[in-house]
Amino acid sequence: MKYLQAIGIGGYILLVGLFLPLRCLAASITPQEAELYFTSSLVSMAAYSEGLNIMTREWLQESGWYFDSRENINKVADGRFHLVSRNLRGNQSVYFLAFPGTERLKDAEIDFRVKRVVFGGKTPQEFKAMAALTDHNGSQPLVHQGFNDYIQVALFQQPLDEFGNRTAGEFLAQELRENPNEILYLTGHSLGGASATLAAARFADLGVRPEQLQVITFGAPAVGNETFARLYEHKMNLTRITMAADPVKSVLQSLTGGFVQFGKKIVWKNNKFERFDHDMVLYLDQSLRAYQDTHPEQEPTPAMMQGTPVKLSGGIYVAPFEFKLDKKLQQDMPYMRRSLKESLQQAYAPLILSEFKEKKSLAALCAEQKQAGARYVLLERFTGHQIRNEHNNFRMMMEEELYDTDGNLLTMQTTSATTQNLTPIEAMVYLQFQAKEQRDKFLQ
């Protein structure tokens, strides 16, 4: 796809950097906000390049999202962003731009490049010249040098022919200026969130209206001094989502003694998982919970959450999910059940969910399958048990069987994972997705 070729007057640009009770210390959020935070956390998770993050990206792609990933590298920074898009109803398109957090050595160097530089200018050349000034004081807008370097390299370093010999940042800003009804959302986790905030400030300096700039960050540190905060807090709409015990959100205030936060603050509390409170998987878990808690299961799926299911001849009859979980995990069973159901609904159509409320024999399931006109019967059993001598680390397992209309076994498989790098609900969805490749070989 040619870069941003689908952007038009009637489209929406959403620029932003995996369904689970909300532990929120802030005011209640609306269903629309929960949907946006959930989508932003998914895309922010997919912006990283590790195995689990790539799986999230693949899941989004199979659900109808397209990733256009860009990378500009020089000795200063490895500037990266992902433009994530999909088509909605009514010939509208939605765009997310995700900035990854720290995952490379050069990213860590960026984080610790804490010298303050002047932030200003109206062109990429002026941006660079202002940051090079050595004579400055607190009355000027000053920002974290490393974060500023990152955005300069990622968005404003390299003019390209496909952008009319302009940088990606200039091109995007012009699209927004020419289409003032379009909305721009920016997001990311940690370094990615800081990058999203500075990118919004740059777009503001390029003439983009404040109401077009919506920023959502997860565990992001402050990026600038008091002057910067007061100058730009009305030039964008910033929502900062943090975990209560996340140390990164305030680390720069301690290191520099002069950086301040601004914007709307939402605080989520991690009172279950004993891991570093800055992990993106925790932010994803809480945003998933918020989404499910504000969207009743019987309501239609919001447009951005809808998948593009594969059309099957006859469809799949899904038996009731079976769970055998340790007591610590049982409170999450409703969220697991809904997440697993919605994941299958996004993957296949038609999908018929069993009306049985309890375990039934295969013969009874096949009888109901035939009555429903389905071609396949899918059985999935899930277990979750604490690993011996490992506090709050669980072994999650899924056993899956796929049968035809006569009750003949087509395939069976077992997948497992621990919760070392995932929350229990995320692990269940991960196991189901891991089984998809083998399952699909037998579906027509």
Language-model region placement:
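Bacterial N-terminal signal peptides
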Residues: G10-R23
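A conserved cap/lid and substrate-binding interface adjacent to the catalytic center
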Residues: Y66-T187, D205-Q212, K235
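Serine-dependent carboxylesterase/thioesterase catalytic core
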Residues: E170-L252
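A structural "domain/chain start" motif
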Residues: A222, Q298-A349, D440-Q444
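Lipolytic serine-hydrolase domain surface
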Residues: N225-T308
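C-terminal/domain-edge helix-coil "capping" segments
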Residues: A303-G314, I387-E390, Y403-Q444
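Short beta-strand->alpha-helix linker/helix-N-cap micro-motif
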Residues: K341-A367
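Surface-exposed short loop/turn segments
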Residues: K359-L410, S416-A417
